[in-house]
């Protein structure tokens, strides 16, 4: 049996985490499988060499996308050319529909087996986008249990595969350990501050979140779980806060904070 080549594309940190778990799971069943594509640090730990840095795709909103539109088009062409040159057995695109669905569209027509992991949330907004999806993929893998029925109403087959947060160990955290580690009193109120994983989100949301904390009638202990791509920005931007937040970078620490 020929060793399969699986091409994966993840455009942001959440997709990178999903891609890493997918590579690990595939290797458990097919140790001979090889992988190529685009991913971040988590997928790199599983042995993937990314075609280009994932941060090039972690953009949000017109104000961030427009200045880099020509760069993004070049990355799209580079990705499509790499897929066509490698001729993988399967292509798995993970979330980031602004980029991944354009890759799938650019590959048409094709006999390549394609799976899109993390269904576009057209059930939440702009449902009319669903009319553009037929033919883009062979398998649509959903994180939420109601999504297959939604897509079935639009004559699109989809499969519920579970949410990655349930596989991440997020339910194993220990709140008492977190308080002890950071010398937080048992009766102190903790406020989790989540400014996002994209640079634009952080620049836009952190000032609002700081002002919100200032307006609270009771004192709180702000805790900020750090996303890798924006860790340096968050550290810099929160350094001058009058109420210094606890910054949590490690996974176990985040699980404890959420507990």
Model-derived segments and spans:
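Conserved acidic residues
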Residues: 88-89, 138, 189, 256-259
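Compositionally biased, intrinsically disordered/low-complexity regions enriched for serine, proline
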Residues: 1, 28, 85, 192, ...
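A general secondary-structure boundary signal
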Residues: 76, 93, 138, 186-187, ...
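Active-site and donor-binding regions of nucleotide-sugar-utilizing enzymes
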Residues: 4-179, 194-202, 215, 227-229, ...
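Secondary-structure boundary/capping positions in well-ordered alpha/beta enzyme cores
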Residues: 33, 110, 158, 185, ...
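Charged active-site motifs of nucleotide-sugar-dependent glycosyltransferases
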Residues: 3-5, 89, 185-192, 221
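Donor-nucleotide binding loops and adjacent catalytic segments primarily
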Residues: 40-41, 50, 200-259
């Amino acid at each position: 049996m020929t060793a399969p080549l699986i091409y994966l594309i993840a455009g942001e940190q959440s997709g990178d985490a999903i891609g890493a778990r997918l590579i690990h799971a595939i290797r458990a069943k097919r140790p001979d499988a090889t992988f190529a594509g685009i991913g971040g640090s988590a997928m790199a730990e599983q042995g993937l060499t990314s075609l280009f840095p994932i941060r090039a795709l972690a953009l949000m909103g017109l104000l961030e996308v427009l200045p880099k539109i020509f760069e993004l088009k070049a990355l799209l062409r580079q990705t499509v050319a790499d897929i066509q040159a490698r001729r993988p057995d399967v292509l798995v695109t993970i979330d980031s529909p602004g980029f991944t669905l354009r890759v799938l569209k650019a590959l048409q027509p094709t006999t390549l087996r394609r799976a899109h992991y993390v269904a576009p949330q057209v059930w939440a907004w702009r449902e009319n986008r669903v009319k553009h999806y037929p033919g883009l993929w062979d398998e649509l893998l959903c994180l939420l249990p109601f999504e297959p029925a939604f897509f079935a109403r639009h004559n699109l087959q989809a499969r519920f595969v579970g949410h990655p947060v349930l596989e991440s160990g997020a339910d194993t955290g220990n709140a008492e350990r977190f308080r002890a580690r950071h010398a937080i009193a048992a009766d102190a109120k903790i406020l989790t501050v989540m400014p996002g994983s994209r640079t634009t989100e952080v620049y836009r949301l952190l000032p609002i979140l700081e002002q919100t904390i200032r307006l609270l009638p009771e004192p709180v202990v702000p805790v900020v779980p750090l996303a890798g791509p924006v860790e340096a920005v968050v550290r810099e931007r929160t350094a001058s806060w009058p109420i210094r937040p606890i910054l949590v970078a490690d996974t176990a620490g985040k699980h404890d904070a959420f507990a």
